[in-house]
């Protein structure tokens, strides 16, 4: 009865007094076994079983027992739903509706049958049956069967009628009827009792609800909360809820070790323990009066908290270290705590010193009083040291916190361990310092102790503590003895103890610090260990040094100082997280690849998850032609070259891919791929490639289209791919949107290949190549004389030569680099042009144009080079050219119409002239043909403002004009026998005239006496290499010279193409580049003394210039007649510098770099008498005005 809840007890008290004398509680499980219900069992539900009371008459009792047996049997047959108990929130148990009505209705009809199935209680009385009926009718609204319908079978769904009150007196009835009458009476009484209990229930439930709210709130603090740590500990929120149910079912006041209450209590105790462990030693050692009120209050409060903690430890669950089980049973908790730390915690929690003082004050013995002063003080201090045993509790709490931090953050766990170790060392130093002073104090400061020797017995406690701590740390760190070495025996033993403790703590600190440092950068440590193994492997196999260096460079670029097991790390992650990490790692690759930018995001994710990272070094062959392809590669960073057997090369850079052709055709590699730089690639195996493309057929068609385009660019065909793409196009597989996407991918791929080639070609121009002057020694023995001339020495050792002379020929995809060049001295160039325009003698300028070498030109002619009509004068022929001579009539201007025809043989000239040009369909030799005269000899039209003097290059390729020459120009003829031309110009049998011809100015420059008009030339425009679109036509005007003749230059740059930036060279260090045909011809012509020389002309430098000026200008043609001393003249005033027969020109052995002016245009020098407008927009000068200092000119020896 004591275990029942109050509401149940009130219900039992409200029963009739003759009923309920003996009752006991039975579990629902036992009820089910006895009644044969077999239903669901709930341990929280209880049922009441009452002993039968003695019945008034045996017959009635027998009949009632039969009826009861029948009713119980019918109830058992109705299943578990009807016989199960009904439990409310306050713990009372009730039957389900209809169960008792069925018992009453079936009592009479099935008495005999129910008697056999009764539970053995044959002596149950009518009072017990009435109690059960009353229990079933306790709640209002429950069904009851009227007495008149007791024997009728129960109709489902029939409305229940309340039982009518029976009359007070009734005649005797049969047994069944007599059994029903007491039931009805009992029901009336129980209803009245139930009404009385319902009036009492609300007040009790309100009080119970108020107390239940506080209990629930406090109970929630004792249970584990749903937070980050509990979720990490138990795995899920459902597991946390199950743990909360465990705490509820364990009993009252069971505290979970991971509950919020225990967390804050442990934090409070931790701070209190630290304060105790610091303050108590200082108070015991340095303060003699310990009975002050603050000290007593502090100790009492501390002891009270520790005693409360001792009690709470008996109700706190214990975490088993072997597994994750948490003990919540109070009996197991008590036994486990008593066997472990109870004794230490109890001794450190009880105030032993105060108990001793209380006992001591009650003893009044005189002998005791006389000797108690010192003894009490000493013993009390020793007993107070028992509180220091709380250190064990501090260590346990810190260990728990370390576990918490270790489960959440690994780095925080390492830091917490280091902080704990440092704090523990400082605490031991603090204790050791107090002990160093406590021992002499307990000995009453003997004369040989360190306190007496240093005279600190009566000093302040701060000074005493400072020196004691210094002495203790000196011992513990093993660096000394403090102020002096120990003298007394007690000091010696204390010193040894300090050294042992200090050495142990120091070793622990070093070990923990090393472990922390290693754990902070484990990946770098792993890389260093791995590379040590690699070094030992290289030493064991005795690899050569260059191989070792390559291995070292590979490891540096591949792992970059950190090594991870990336496959295992990603394999342990979930698939969405793995895809997110891979997408982040490959974000640069996706951003730079047009294929991925235009593709389905699902395709990109599927592709990226199957990629494998690889690194290749410069010179590594990633793919070799003819091998079976098993991978394709995506370039994240780097440049590779696609090589074929035809030596046709293609560059691929960041964002491109290669190796997909054999994966698509299941064939062999069609080209080799070599890494030009360090390449960071992602590889895709053939199985993964086909697996991905099966899901995305549009991307397969994109790969096939790009592969066909690439094969076409390197000059190869693949019938399988071509057939597949053609079949897709004919079958209409491509819709408009897919076709647009594929075309965009192909266009981006072409652009990337073009950009990669340009970048690589520009980078290859940076190294210092072979000088131009030494190329003829290898290519043509006929040109060997050029190396011995002063011009060769001057050009080779000159530090300021333009970079265009030493640059290699541009590649097929390089394009017009002249457009992007920047002039080094633009203002100097603008100031030199008007000066040259007003000079009497022409000024020459070095050529800034890239020209092909003589060997390449010779190969083109041997291979059957057929020049267009406009270029026929460039190739001397024995049948088509008349004898060389000079034409005195000026050429006529030629109209230009642009064409798009390309000429492979003239591609180098086109690139030399600056990129994509447009030319005229009329022959270029119109102004160059012998005997061509201009009908407009008197009226020179103004030259085009945008004209560039790029044809100065062609001037040195022209054969000598016919023999008709003007009188004014014949004394200044410059000649070279055709037989002495370089092999690059020998296209056929050279013409050998009887007398050695003298090359004169070309016909387009020779109209001097007639005041010939300048002629604009438009070279061929379709001469650009593949990939270049023709640009607007460019015209090249020919300026009319004076009577003395207008002379071309040795090195002729286009005026609109500024010199590229060049790397300064040291004097005497020749830059190394391939040679140029132009330079070879000029140098040979300059080194052949074909004409008699009248006298030696010396090169005179008028004024020095800074080394920033580009190059010296050399006058190729002489100045005939008497000339005024205008700027640009080389000799004394009035002395012509013509090539007089019998005269030799002596060249200086050294040419100063300061005497070289910036390059000038081909037609930058005009005669003073020319009336035509200037060629440039620079301001004009008077012919006699000296705008620039006189420069030294190198006259030709021809």
Swiss-Prot record:
Q: Which reaction does it catalyse?
A: K(+)(in) = K(+)(out); Na(+)(in) = Na(+)(out)
Question: Phosphoserine: which positions carry it?
Answer: 139, 1103, 1106
Q: Where in the cell is it found?
A: Cell membrane
- Which sequence ranges are listed under topological domain Extracellular? 288-293, 362-368, 442-464, 487-496
Q: Name one GO molecular function term.
A: voltage-gated potassium channel activity involved in SA node cell action potential depolarization
Q: What is its main location?
A: membrane
InterPro entries in the record, alphabetically?
A: cNMP-bd_CS (IPR018488), cNMP-bd_dom (IPR000595), cNMP-bd_dom_sf (IPR018490), Ion_trans_dom (IPR005821), Ion_trans_N (IPR013621), K/Na_HCN_channel (IPR051413), K_chnl_volt-dep_EAG/ELK/ERG (IPR003938), RmlC-like_jellyroll (IPR014710)
The biased composition feature labelled Gly residues covers 105-118, 1120-1132
Residue ranges annotated as compositionally biased, kind Low complexity, are 831-856, 866-880, 895-905, 913-937, 965-985, 1043-1054
Quaternary arrangement and interactors, per the entry? Homotetramer. The potassium channel is composed of a homo- or heterotetrameric complex of pore-forming subunits. Interacts with PEX5L with a 4:4 HCN4:PEX5L stoichiometry; reduces the effects of cAMP on the voltage-dependence and rate of activation. Interacts with IRAG1; regulates HCN4 channel activity. Interacts with IRAG2; regulates HCN4 channel activity.
Function, please? Hyperpolarization-activated ion channel that are permeable to Na(+) and K(+) ions with very slow activation and inactivation. Exhibits higher selectivity for K(+) over Na(+) ions. Contributes to the native pacemaker currents in heart (If) that regulate the rhythm of heart beat. Contributes to the native pacemaker currents in neurons (Ih). May mediate responses to sour stimuli.
Please identify the protein, giving its name as recorded. Potassium/sodium hyperpolarization-activated cyclic nucleotide-gated channel 4
Q: What is the lineage of its organism?
A: Eukaryota, Metazoa, Chordata, Craniata, Vertebrata
